[in-house]
C-alpha cells in the first residue's frame, strides 16, 4: 500500500524542474516511509500527505524568524500537521518540509557532497521531524541521527554524521 502522497511547490529560482524534484522527493520519502514502517511506525490506512516547499534563503529566513525566533536562513524547517511522538499513528496530513536552495548549495560545497546527496539527507531529516523525532537532547539526537543514517544507507549514501564530534 502506498503510504504517502507527496506534494511539492517550487517558490524560488535555481531549483531543478518540478518533474525532477517530484520524482526525487517521492523516491526519497517513499523509501524513508517504508523504512520507518518496517521499524514499527504505524501509518494511516490512506496515503498521508506531505508537502515539500523548495524555496530560497530570503524566504526561509523570514519563516525561521517568525516560527523559531531565529532571524537567519537555515537549511530545512519542518512543520508537523499534528504534534506526535515517535511511534504514534499520524493523521492523514503529515505536514510541511521547507528547504532553502542557497543554504543547501553552500553546505553541500562545505561538506564536499553533491547537492542531491545533501538535499536527500535534509529531506529525510525533515521527514523524521514530522513523526516527532528531534535532536534537542543527546539521546534524541542519537536516535534521530541513527535512523537518518540507516535510511540514507538504504539509498546508497554514507553516514552524514561520520567524523563529527557529538555536541
UniProtKB/Swiss-Prot annotation:
EC number: 3.1.-.-
One GO location term (cellular component): cytoplasm
S-S bridge residues: none
Binding residues annotated for Zn(2+), in chain numbering: 125, 129, 135
Cofactor(s) this protein requires: Zn(2+)
GO terms of molecular function: metalloendopeptidase activity; RNA endonuclease activity; zinc ion binding
Cofactor note (record): Binds 1 zinc ion.
Keywords: Cytoplasm, Endonuclease, Hydrolase, Metal-binding, Nuclease, Ribosome biogenesis, rRNA processing, Zinc
Subcellular location: Cytoplasm
Top-level taxon of the source organism: Bacteria
PANTHER family hit by this protein: ENDORIBONUCLEASE YBEY, CHLOROPLASTIC
Protein name listed in UniProt: Endoribonuclease YbeY
Gene from which this protein is expressed: ybeY
Amino acid at each position: 500500500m502506498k503510504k504517502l502522497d507527496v506534494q511539492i511547490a517550487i517558490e524560488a529560482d535555481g531549483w531543478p524542474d518540478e518533474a525532477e524534484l517530484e520524482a526525487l522527493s517521492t523516491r526519497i520519502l517513499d523509501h524513508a516511509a517504508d523504512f520507518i514502517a518496517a521499524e514499527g511506525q504505524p501509518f494511516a490506512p490512506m496515503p498521508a500527505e506531505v508537502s515539500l516547499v523548495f524555496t530560497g534563503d530570503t524566504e526561509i529566513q523570514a519563516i525561521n524568524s517568525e516560527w523559531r525566533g531565529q532571524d537567519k536562513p537555515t537549511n530545512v524547517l519542518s512543520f508537523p500537521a499534528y504534534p506526535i511522538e515517535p511511534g504514534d499513528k499520524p493523521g492523514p496530513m503529515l505536514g510541511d518540509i521547507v528547504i532553502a536552495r542557497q543554504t543547501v548549495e553552500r553546505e553541500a560545497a562545505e561538506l564536499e557532497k553533491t547537492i542531491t546527496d545533501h538535499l536527500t539527507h535534509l529531506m529525510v531529516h525533515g521527514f523524521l521531524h514530522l513523526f516527532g523525532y528531534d535532536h534537542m537532547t543527546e539521546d534524541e539526537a542519537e536516535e534521530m541521527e541513527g535512523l537518518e543514517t540507516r535510511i540514507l544507507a538504504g539509498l546508497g549514501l554514507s553516514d552524514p554524521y561520520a567524523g563529527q564530534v557529538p555536541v
